[in-house]
UniProtKB/Swiss-Prot annotation:
Principal subcellular localisation of the protein: secreted
Cystine pairings recorded for this chain: none
Name of the protein in its database record: Collagen alpha-1(VI) chain
Assigned protein family: Belongs to the type VI collagen family.
GO biological process: cell adhesion
Post-translational modification: Prolines at the third position of the tripeptide repeating unit (G-X-Y) are hydroxylated in some or all of the chains.
Keyword field contains Signal: yes
Residues glycosylated per entry: 212, 514, 535, 799, 887
Location of region: Disordered: 248-588
Domain VWFA: 37-233, 613-800, 824-1012
Sequence ranges of Pro residues compositional bias: 253-262, 577-588
Gene: COL6A1
Organism: Gallus gallus (Chicken)
Function: Collagen VI acts as a cell-binding protein.
Composition bias, Low complexity: 427-436
Length: 1019
């Protein structure tokens, strides 16, 4: 029995050792694995799902590509004795993101992942690739391994939508940059055909991650292309991972495992664990020791005012006061004489086209997605590689000592928080490598109040602060009481000698003497010199002396003295005598020129559009696509905005109105229009248009047009209305028998045919029927475009608004002219090379306008005004295109048939030629007038020669008018042509006989032809 028990114990011991060794081997193998985290991002939007028939075929190819890729995810052995292991997951997206499967280890999760991919049902709506990439990044970071350089995204998409589409998650550039910032490599795989390489290049990490990867193809070599794409991507990942996993020196292959070793010694003490959860509140402690000496107390309150002090000593004399403030400025002077009126400026040129308008408002946000299901709890991660410690930062500069602050009040301790729940102890992982700095997060909510901290140690005393600024000067104290009389002082120093006293009065006479007169005594010795007398007081200033004679002039001083102070304004002088009358000014603008100026400067005189009722019929079928549907709505709003701003159309009750009908298959029409219960202005209508949802059904255009006629056009009362139909021109006429010409009887129609999401061209026959081009009356306009983005082109919008406002109401700028006498008017047209054929055609149109105006003017008799047209070029190159004629139809036809000579310029020969014509053809009693088209440049002709010829023309009774075009004008020759004088140019005469325009297009601009014809008729 004992032997049996010993044998059983030995078996148990060997079994435990064998199990322990297997566990150790498994741990060794797991530690040597080199994991790769791979996530598929699959596009199942409408641009992929509905591109080819049968619908969903490209999605099926994408699923097949993904499953074939998953089958290739097998372990790879590296020479550094490590194995490449795969973790794979997938999502698919359209305008929302659906997680197919989170990261799953291969090969154990291969079958489940493939089944999930095969079960995909495409969404078939908008394409939000930016949101899908960011969701894939999140799944890689949350569910992947701890390594940073082993994460890959496989983005399978066609690159749609087009540029300019507003993506809700920051845009494709932002998503691609975020992946690069986090070290995630992104492969972009195309869904062909019609993919957008530009967008795919943005998605890829660099060109090596894009190349020519494709997941679908309509070519016979599809399987080979897909297989090559999968193999190339896997080889790139394998090479990248081998470099990162085998960065150390390679070792030879490991041998078979040896026998178990002896039990090791007791291990070293482990690292301190993480701080545990906050424990329960402890028992109250014993009373603490006496605390340290308290801080200095707070500053006391201000004391009461002291008693009044005694009178102080008399203060010393104060310092001299500061300079006073400058005095107030003097009164404003009298107004000067009014200036003379300035000369009238010439009308300016037309301004350049303004910059494009501001970008429109962003569209409305889509509905918020539903809350996702909670994910499964992840397995604990493997122990990471310890990160290298960061470099020690450089010591900062010592800051300046702050001012000594006053001690604050001691705060009251906060309440103890409730005991927290004790959490389970997690495994302590080594610190990872420092990650890149993430984007700045939003401001978080304030955290709960922390526990009351213990009293810190007394800080070191601060450095002594700098002396404060001197305080303000104190107020003068009150006078103290009178003091007691002081003791008698010591005698003072002797004072200064006083002034001499007054002369005393004469004394009384003494008694008479009784002695004899003695002899004169000898002269005494001269006495000593007396002390100097005291200086007398200063005398008063004496009277001013007479003015002395002027001295000789001094030497010149080359240095100028300082400028004196500006003197005060002098008194107004007397009014001067009126000056002599000035010369006669040039004549003011006539009536036609005033109208021209008003038309250019006054916006109220511009042509106005409206009232006009506008009807939009919007195709919302499946073949349009969600993105194109959004663009079509933007187009409607932009047309309304342009009509409001550029054409000043007022969309309000009683004025212009707008309505929009969107449609798909039968009975799916939706109407929004001004006059609805919840739409009372144009802003509400535009918001209602933005809120229209894509129907994505069939296409019954005829039924929609009939619905618009019965439900919308009956609301419109204006005779001026336009319908704009936006469709791909592919109506299902088998199911919809309603004719496409339903609107032809009631309104002009513009049919806009745009290629669908499959790039199929619109049906031109249906578009022509919608636009009523086969009808005898009310024919509209049919326009075709390749894609919907062209609808938002500036020039295209301009063409649409111009058609809507083709019947503008313009002010009447008629400027009637009257001939008081018969007149024979000749138009002498320059046909030389310097004019150019295009400008010559412009001149012909201008000549026809002049001829029509001359012949339709008020005149004494029907045949009293005749017009002739002659063109000229070089010498002996003159041609009468129209002899004197009063029939405008004949003149217009002849002018249209005029051929450009394209030769030299000789205006002298032309003037001599027309003198002969007038002598042969002019009537007696009729005024002779000629309008010469010339810039004054004539080959080989001097101003003196022109002067002689013009004087001969004037002597023949012919009045000359000149029309100069352009800026390269020979001014002296032009003045001679007008006046016949090379000197003493008469400005007033020139104003009536000389016309100038900056270029040939200005001939047909405004009412210039009326100005020219009026001046010729009046003179």
């Amino acid at each position: 029995m004992g032997l049996h028990d010993s044998f059983l114990a030995l078996l148990l011991l060997l079994g435990g050792a064998w199990a322990q060794q297997a566990e150790i081997n498994a741990r060794v193998l797991r530690a040597q694995d080199c994991p790769v985290d791979l996530f598929f991002v699959l596009d199942t939007s409408e641009s992929v799902a509905l591109r080819v028939k049968p619908f969903g075929d490209l999605v099926a190819q994408v699923k097949d590509f993904t499953n074939r890729f998953i089958d290739k995810l097998t372990e790879r052995y590296f020479r550094c004795d490590r194995f490449l292991a795969w973790n794979a997951g997938a999502l698919h997206y359209s305008d929302s993101v659906v997680i197919i499967k989170d990261l799953t280890a291969m090969p154990s999760g291969r079958a489940e992942l493939k089944n999930s991919v095969s079960a995909i049902n495409y969404i078939g709506k908008g394409t939000h690739t930016d949101c899908a990439i960011k969701q894939g990044i999140e799944r890689l970071l949350l569910g992947g391994s701890h390594l940073k350089e082993n994460k890959y995204l496989i983005v399978v998409t066609d690159g749609h939508p087009l540029e300019g589409y507003k993506e809700p998650c920051g845009g494709l550039d932002d998503a691609a940059n975020e992946a690069k910032h986090l070290g995630i490599k992104v492969f972009s795989v195309a869904i062909s055909p019609h993919h957008l390489d530009q967008r795919l290049n943005i998605i890829a990490t660099d060109h090596a991650y894009r190349r020519n990867f494709t997941a679908t193809s309509l070519k016979p070599t599809r399987d080979l292309d897909v297989e090559e794409t999968i193999n190339n991507i896997i080889e790139m990942i394998k090479d990248n991972m081998e470099q990162s996993c085998c960065s150390f020196e390679c070792h030879p292959p490991r041998g078979p495992p040896g026998p178990p070793g002896d039990p090791g010694h007791e291990g070293e003490r482990g690292k301190p664990g993480l701080p545990g959860q906050k424990g329960d509140a402890g028992d109250p402690g014993r009373p603490g020791d006496m605390g340290p000496v308290g801080y200095q107390g707070m500053k006391g309150d201000k004391g009461s005012r002291g008693e009044k002090g005694s009178r102080g000593a008399k203060g010393a004399k104060g310092e001299k006061g500061k300079r006073g403030i400058d005095g107030i400025d003097g009164m404003k002077g009298e107004a000067g004489y009014p200036g003379l009126p300035g000369c009238k400026g010439s009308p300016g040129f037309d301004g350049t086209q303004g910059p494009p308008g501001p970008k429109g408002d962003p569209g409305a946000y889509g509905p918020k997605g539903g809350k996702g299901e909670p994910g499964e709890d992840g397995k604990p991660g493997r122990q990471g590689i310890p990160g290298s410690p960061g470099e020690k930062g450089a010591p900062g500069n010592r800051g300046e000592p702050g001012p000594l602050g006053e001690t604050g009040d001691e705060g009251s301790p906060g309440a103890d928080g409730p005991p927290g729940e004790r959490g389970s102890n997690g495994e302590r992982g080594p610190p990872g490598s420092p990650g890149d700095r993430g984007p700045r997060g939003d401001l978080g909510e304030p955290g709960p109040p922390g526990d009351q901290g213990r009293e810190g140690p007394l800080g070191p005393p601060g450095d002594q602060g700098e002396p404060g600024p001197p305080g303000p000067k104190g107020y003068r104290g009150d006078d103290g009481p009178r003091g007691n009389e002081g003791p008698k002082g010591s005698p003072g120093a002797p004072g200064l000698p006083g002034d001499p006293g007054l002369m005393g009065e004469r004394g009384e006479d003494g008694p008479p003497g009784n002695g004899t007169i003695g002899f004169p005594g000898a002269p005494g010795q001269q006495g000593d010199r007396g002390d100097p007398g005291i200086n007398g007081t200063k005398g008063y200033v004496g009277p001013k002396g007479d003015e002395g004679e002027a001295g000789d002039p001094g030497n010149d001083n080359p240095t100028a003295g300082p400028s004196g102070i500006k003197g005060a304004k002098g008194h107004r002088g007397p009014e001067g005598r009126p000056g002599p009358p000035g010369p006669v000014g040039p004549p003011g603008p006539d009536e036609c020129e005033i109208l021209d100026i008003i038309m250019k400067m006054c916006s109220c005189c511009e042509c106005t559009c409206g009232p006009v009722d506008l009807l939009f019929v919007l195709d919302s079928s499946e073949s349009i696509g969600l993105q194109n549907f959004q663009i079509a709505k933007d187009f409607i709003i932009k047309v309304i905005d342009r009509l409001s701003k550029d054409e000043r159309v007022k969309f309000e009750p009683g004025e212009s109105r707008v309505g929009v009908v969107q449609y798909s298959h039968n009975n799916t029409q939706e109407l929004v229009a001004m006059g609805d219960a919840n739409i009372d202005n144009i802003g509400a209508l535009k918001q209602a248009v933005k809120n229209l949802k894509w129907i994505a059904g069939g296409t019954h255009t005829g039924e929609a047009l009939q619905f618009s006629k019965e439900n919308l056009l009956r609301r419109f009362t204006s005779n001026n209305n336009v319908a704009i139909v936006i469709t791909d021109g592919r109506s299902d006429t088998l199911r919809d028998r309603t004719p496409l010409t339903s609107l032809c009887e009631v309104t002009p129609v513009v049919s806009l045919g745009i290629g669908d999401i499959f790039r199929n061209n619109p049906n031109p026959d249906q578009l022509n029927d919608i636009a009523c081009l086969g009808m005898p009356r009310r024919q509209g306009l049919s326009i075709q475009r390749d894609n919907y983005a062209e609808l938002l082109d500036d020039s295209f919008l301009q063409n649409i608004t111009s058609y809507v406002c083709r019947e503008k109401k313009c002010p009447d700028y008629t400027c009637p002219i009257t001939f008081a006498n018969p007149a024979d008017i000749m138009l002498l047209v320059d046909s030389s090379t310097s004019v150019g054929s295009k400008n010559f055609d412009t001149t012909k149109n201008f000549v026809k306008r002049l001829a029509e105006r001359f012949l339709e003017a008020s005149k004494p008799a029907e045949d009293s005004v005749r017009v002739s047209v002659v063109q000229y070029s070089g010498r002996n190159q003159q041609k009468v295109e129209v002899p004197f004629q009063r029939n405008y139809t004949v003149i217009a036809k002849a002018v249209d048939n005029m051929e450009f000579m394209n030769e030299a310029t000789d205006v002298n020969a032309a003037l001599q030629y027309i003198m002969g014509l007038y002598q042969r053809s002019s009537r007696s009693g009729a005024k002779k007038k000629v309008l010469v088209f010339s810039d004054g440049n004539s080959q080989g002709i001097t101003a003196r020669a022109i002067e002689r010829t013009v004087q001969e023309v004037q002597q023949a009774g012919i009045e000359v008018y000149v029309l100069a075009v352009g800026s390269q004008v020979n001014e002296p020759n032009v003045r001679v042509l007008v006046t016949g004088k090379s000197t003493n140019y008469d400005v007033a005469y020139g104003e009536r006989h000389l016309f100038r325009v900056p270029d040939y297009t200005s001939l047909l601009r405004g009412v210039f032809y009326q100005t020219v014809s009026r001046k010729i008729a009046v003179d």
